Amino acid sequence: MSQSGSKQGIPLPVGLTIQPLKGMETEDWYPAPDKIYASNLALETTAQLQQTDIFPSVKEAVPATGKEGFAIENKVKLTFHPDFANEAELLKEKLATIHGLEVVSEAPVTVHLDYLPERETAVNGEYYRIDTGNGLINISASTSHGIFNGTQTLLSLLKGQEKLFRLEALSIRDYPDLPYRGQMLDIARNFTTVEHLKKLVDVISSYKLNVLHFHFSDDEGWRLEIPGLEELTSVGARRGHTTDELECLYPGYDGNYDPSAATSGNGYYTREEFIDLLRYAAQRHVRVIPEIESPGHARAAIVSM
């Protein structure tokens, strides 16, 4: 301040060093695959895993006393309580398609699905136990969801093995800590087929995730047929070259500027396809939660209407 009280407009010196910008010629912005491969080779792979070191990990796995481990060649017998017929059918399919194991009426090894013994109380609705030994694999739970989780653990125990499969004599107790274990998929911006959605359901259910967050509406697209509001899909499910957006939305992301092309910019699920997806997911104990964006991120719906 000066004696008169006014500020003096004198700039203060500031030490500032400007570093030269690094361009594409000095930085490896896009590492080649061979460099990534070489880097991956440097990772330590010496850890000795146990048979029960699976993902997701189980709460408890201990050796079963008084029982012997056993081998599974190419066939198993599958028995089950009638309440678990759906889970038995899914297990039969996966044993065949993933591990090449045929389910027959008589075999040295039996897989049995049943309710928990009356003396045992489930921690929650997804609790299950697996007891293996002497040629028997017993999966028990208080609900069909628990049985399904147990079958996914069995499939994981067999992963990474060549025929002949071997199972140790084990006693496994497991349950999830969190009731909501979900995966969000944004198909508003990038559409995909129902077949791909079913594959996703298969994958997430194999890891015991139980929710598919179905993000089907956003600024860039509306992907679900609503009877009586056909314009939501006739306009909102298509992106392409347009000056007025009367027949389709602006390109945004992909679409090849062609609203009729089979790209991730175009497409929607019919009412019947969505119902089929819901049933498919429910069989695998996955809950589908549709999400309608509003009031923000609702441009596709607003333009369409």
Model regions: which residues?
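Acidic, contiguous N-terminal accessory segments
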Residues: 2-181
